[in-house]
Amino acid sequence: MITLVLLFTAFNADDSQAILQAEKQWMAAIQKADGPALEKLLHIQLIYGHSTGITDSKASYIGKVSSGKQKYAGVEQEIIKTQFIGDTALVHAKMHMWGINQNGKFDDRLMLMQTWLKRDGRWQLVAHQTAKLAQ
């Protein structure tokens, strides 16, 4: 019984580190406008909800970022909580994102909820939603 608990804890620690790494890779990819990296990180059924109410699919979001229509000059993240439910991980965080998009410059402080799904041994982002915080 004790052995099983220790193995379960180690498994969760590995997944926790993998999710933190996936979050860092996502932030780096959007700042670098790295379409190929986003292609690997984002799930085919991605729902990407912006704080403006606009929703993107995987293809439309990669298109915006790769073309420069959604350009991130900076991204900072403070993770509040991660939670695992089987092969699903939830990440709740505070974000500061700034850059330029089709509406002009943005400098947003946000609450973020991301859902990651583990498939074939790797984590992919399947849902993203932000809400603006009071400045």
Regions found by a protein language model. Give the residues of each.
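Short, low-complexity N-terminal intrinsically disordered segments enriched in polar/charged residues
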Residues: 2-44, 84
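Hydrophobic pocket/interface hotspot
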Residues: 26, 38, 46, 61, ...
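A short gly/proline-enriched turn/hairpin at secondary-structure junctions
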Residues: 30, 41, 45-56, 66-71, ...
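A mature extracytoplasmic/lumenal domain signature
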Residues: 42, 52, 76, 95-97, ...
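Short, solvent-exposed loop/turn segments at secondary-structure boundaries
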Residues: 52-53, 102-105
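Surface-exposed, charged secondary-structure patches
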Residues: 62-102
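Short beta-strand edge/turn micro-motifs at domain boundaries
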Residues: 109-134
